[in-house]
Amino acid sequence: MTNQAEEKRILIMAGGTGGHVFPALAVAKYLSQQGWKVRWLGTAERMEARLVPQHGFDIDFIDIKGVRGNGLMRKLAAPFKIIRSVMQARAVIKKFKPHVVMGMGGFASGPGGVAAKLSGIPLVLHEQNAIPGMTNRLLSRIASEVLCAFDGTFTDIKAETVGNPIRKELIALGEKRKPVCDDDSLKVLVVGGSLGAKIFNDVMPSVLEGVSKTHSMTVWHQVGRDNLATVKAEYQRLGQDGSVSVAEFIDDMEAAYRWADVVVCRSGALTVSELAAVGLPSLLVPYPHAVDDHQTKNAKVLVNAGAAFLLPQPIVDTSKLMTKLSMLASDKQELCNMGQRARDVAILDATQRVANVCIRLAEKG
């Protein structure tokens, strides 16, 4: 650890979803190991309030909520609330005196980014999705550096493609993972997120029943909160309970990725980057209600590389999934090829790239 006079400080703004928080935590841990003091800016009602302290970082809260889709009165009041939240963020900056402020998405990023600009502190933005969110689109005009995970995210400003920071354990897994290209049972990991994906919960029991008539297939199905009993009962009704493991949550995604031959999942930015780093083929069903349909654009990063299949939710049914999984079960070499193509598009040093931009700006003063 450097002494107090030399210690660099960064204020990180990332919240609301794991897709914002976890990449930011990867950068925070890296910089902390380099002797930096890290502090967080977030909102008390969102997941960062719980996750960030669990990982050993202090967090300050400001009062801010999203404005998309709100009623007229809330929209009229929004400018006054934003001004208040900017003032709150400026107070945090004045007290903490960061050398750099980094925004990675979430409600606090907007006021925090404006406060950084008003305070004369370098502002780094990182956009995880292939289509930038509204806050990052606005802040990109005043940021010192704009970073993105995927090529072509920002079309009207200069942005550096650096990838999405992910946990170093997953990068290590990708380096040593050997895809199964023999005649073993096809191992299918189904991930629906914390609440589960209803489409997966509805069709996967029938998919397993259908594919198992001609190929050996086992499933590890993450069904989400309060869905365990219903989905498990459907697998049992179809006589497939011996070929499936059903869980509300999967705490150890490293173990799940290590086990799987192919993944059926949504296409959030972090998921896409993890699949690439680990080198896993996938069937991607973008969440149809994502803002600006950004999950479809995320998915195309892997689809265009030949590492994944894109299945828009309106066309997903038992037959579609059966066809794709049966094809992969009968052609393990293509499964291996898809995994290698996924690995080929991965940016494995994203954490260091983002951190190095912060370090460079701090050294410039």
Swiss-Prot record:
Recorded topology in the membrane: Peripheral membrane protein
Keywords in alphabetical order: Cell cycle, Cell division, Cell inner membrane, Cell membrane, Cell shape, Cell wall biogenesis/degradation, Glycosyltransferase, Membrane, Peptidoglycan synthesis, Transferase
Molecular function GO labels: UDP-N-acetyl-D-glucosamine:N-acetylmuramoyl-L-alanyl-D-glutamyl-meso-2,6-diaminopimelyl-D-alanyl-D-alanine-diphosphoundecaprenol 4-beta-N-acetylglucosaminlytransferase activity; undecaprenyldiphospho-muramoylpentapeptide beta-N-acetylglucosaminyltransferase activity
One Gene Ontology term from the biological process aspect of the record: cell wall organization
GO cellular component: plasma membrane
EC number per UniProt: 2.4.1.227
Signal peptide span: none
Binding-site residues for UDP-N-acetyl-alpha-D-glucosamine, renumbered to this chain: 17-19, 129, 167, 194, 250, 269-274, 295
Catalytic activity of the protein: di-trans,octa-cis-undecaprenyl diphospho-N-acetyl-alpha-D-muramoyl-L-alanyl-D-glutamyl-meso-2,6-diaminopimeloyl-D-alanyl-D-alanine + UDP-N-acetyl-alpha-D-glucosamine = di-trans,octa-cis-undecaprenyl diphospho-[N-acetyl-alpha-D-glucosaminyl-(1->4)]-N-acetyl-alpha-D-muramoyl-L-alanyl-D-glutamyl-meso-2,6-diaminopimeloyl-D-alanyl-D-alanine + UDP + H(+)
InterPro entries per UniProt: GlcNAc_MurG, Glyco_trans_28_C, GlycoTrans_28_N
Pfam families from the UniProt entry: Glyco_tran_28_C, Glyco_transf_28
Localisation per UniProt entry: Cell inner membrane
Pathway: Cell wall biogenesis; peptidoglycan biosynthesis
Matching HAMAP family: MurG
Family: Belongs to the glycosyltransferase 28 family. MurG subfamily.
Function according to Swiss-Prot or TrEMBL: Cell wall formation. Catalyzes the transfer of a GlcNAc subunit on undecaprenyl-pyrophosphoryl-MurNAc-pentapeptide (lipid intermediate I) to form undecaprenyl-pyrophosphoryl-MurNAc-(pentapeptide)GlcNAc (lipid intermediate II).
Identification of the protein by name: UDP-N-acetylglucosamine--N-acetylmuramyl-(pentapeptide) pyrophosphoryl-undecaprenol N-acetylglucosamine transferase
